[in-house]
């Protein structure tokens, strides 16, 4: 099983539980840090995320992950807020955060570049529509996006 398949399996196990607790599952990472595996789960909801929220979700997921055992080695579970520069992963993210400043990196060059920054206009026919800071409106196919996240507005 690939790392991507493992993450997908974990998401399928935990997303219903996270949703039942009233939160959105934003992202899941399984990474090696300081010679330990870390399963990092990012959650959100409209009112922001506090320590009590993270603890509630962590306790619920701990038990659920023990039952399903999708990770064949020991790991540390961390639950946290996605932060101000949260990733945009799902179609609904590109709709919900329309009007916000974003950064998008693509797998391949589009119009001679792979990095785009600008104001997110929304989603249109499987394309993210972006008003870039320097070259006007661009449409980026969803399947070409390697990484997308909000930009911190000061």
UniProtKB/Swiss-Prot annotation:
The keyword Nucleotide-binding does not apply. HAMAP family: RimP. Its main location: cytoplasm. Disulfide bonds: none annotated. This is Ribosome maturation factor RimP. GO terms for biological process: ribosomal small subunit assembly; translation. Belongs to the RimP family. CDD domains: YlxS_C. Required for maturation of 30S ribosomal subunits. Keywords: Cytoplasm, Ribosome biogenesis. Gene3D superfamilies: Ribosome maturation factor RimP, C-terminal domain (2.30.30.180), RimP-like superfamily, N-terminal (3.30.300.70). InterPro entries: Ribosome_maturation_RimP (IPR003728), RimP_C (IPR028998), RimP_C_sf (IPR036847), RimP_N (IPR028989), RimP_N_sf (IPR035956). The lineage of its organism: Bacteria, Bacillati, Bacillota, Clostridia, Natranaerobiales. It is found in: Cytoplasm. PANTHER family: RIBOSOME MATURATION FACTOR RIMP (PTHR33867:SF1). GO terms for cellular component: cytosol. It comes from the Bacteria.
